[in-house]
């Protein structure tokens, strides 16, 4: 056991010596011992500290937007944390950032764009209507408010609505019976 540890340490030492000889040909690659310290310094570094890494150059530049005189793209030498199994914390989006529907079909999308363009054109001509109703027909709005909704706020159809009412009535009955049995058990023990 100890001999294998010594062989391993000797092997690492000879590997480091060879790296020092070849250092003028290639940039040094971090060894396995330094791997943990690199990962922890990348993950736990504060944004205001001086040892934080600057973002590297984008590895895949588009040749159409690059100048003729610009230097050719260099290979990306940064550390890919996703490939090492380290998860980065994402920046949470503000809750009011998404004001539009997320899923629309092609016709709806083109209709939305067409309305935005016409509204922008009217605003540029100062002909925009100041007070717009949020909905066109009051009765349709009231009906939509009263309709039961399912997962994601979508309207339920009649078949699913009946199942939804049966499930909720069944749950209420089971909750009532469980509550009565619990009260009977507690009154019987005291």
Curated annotation (Swiss-Prot):
Pfam families membership: CBFB_NFYA
Gene3D superfamilies recorded: 6.10.250.2430
Family matches, as SMART domains: CBF
Chain segments carrying region Disordered: 1-33, 147-190
A cellular component annotation (GO) from this entry: nucleus
Sequence ranges of Low complexity compositional bias: 177-190
Function of the protein: Stimulates the transcription of various genes by recognizing and binding to a CCAAT motif in promoters.
Assembly information from the UniProt record: Heterotrimeric transcription factor composed of three components, NF-YA, NF-YB and NF-YC. NF-YB and NF-YC must interact and dimerize for NF-YA association and DNA binding.
Protein name: Nuclear transcription factor Y subunit A-7
Higher taxonomy: Eukaryota, Viridiplantae, Streptophyta, Embryophyta, Tracheophyta
Gene designation per UniProt: NFYA7
